[in-house]
């Protein structure tokens, strides 16, 4: 995402002179909610005694996993995120497990075997949204990324409006990251069932295609990922549950197997979604005013290590990068000029 600001300056001549009894805990704050991706965690199957122990630990562990250096693109963009924990108390711990005839009393009705798939763990999204909206009421916090932590050890998860996972499972952190690929970046699964053939149209997800000639990710063709297991970006047959007729961009990324990085196409999609929520500049000098030689023009970026700011006068680059520029240092002749700050 690019942001361009236009300042007017006047160089004078010498003669002129901002439900469930749930509570909210902010666990990571990198800036105003209006210009950050707000990660909202909600838990199910946690009793009151587990909220500040098990649930807290599950959320903290998940956050640490997201911003682990091996899970690009999140570490580079950490300052673009805030994170908040909605504390919802259940009467009993765990989740329903119909196949094993286990039923527990939880606030959000988390259950395995959703849609008849044993490992598909999900909860009542209406109840989850009601709890979260109540906890956030009056806080000014947006809901940009929805994350559902379920207090269960059995493998399972699901990605829809909410990314939901069994937080007590041994691979819980990978499940969480994979499901966020669905819920936030709208990515498709890249694994498949042997023998299945695709007979539908072109999928709308960016990481699967039914027709390589459409060139869905041609701009990345030949890119050799630093992770050798991901390999070179190409069109690999087998994706979205079908062995034939659908193609994925890489041999083996996070959307195909757990404990893998995201490939370039998925990383790019995450970054695009981040910039839909975050303006690269947090604040700037009033750009509706006119300034003189004694003034300094400035902007504040979300993260100067990620965002470069280039300055222009009347459309011509000054070759200057930085968050401020002194007008006097530009050595402009007397007159009126337009100065632009462009985030890169």
Q: What is each residue range found by the language model?
A:
Residues 1-18:
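Secretory targeting signatures
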Residues 19-135:
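Propeptide-to-catalytic entry region of secreted or membrane-anchored zinc metalloproteases
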Residues 42-46, 86-89, 148-153, 186-188, ...:
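Active-site-proximal beta-strand/loop segments in catalytic clefts of secreted hydrolases
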Residues 50-56, 156-177:
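Short pre-active-site segment immediately N-terminal to the catalytic Zn-binding motif
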Residues 94-97, 128-166:
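Catalytic zinc-binding patch centered on the HExxH motif and its immediate surroundings
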Residues 173-190:
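Active-site recognition of the HExxH zinc-binding catalytic motif
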Residues 329-336:
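Surface-exposed, short loops/turns at beta-strand junctions within beta-sandwich domains
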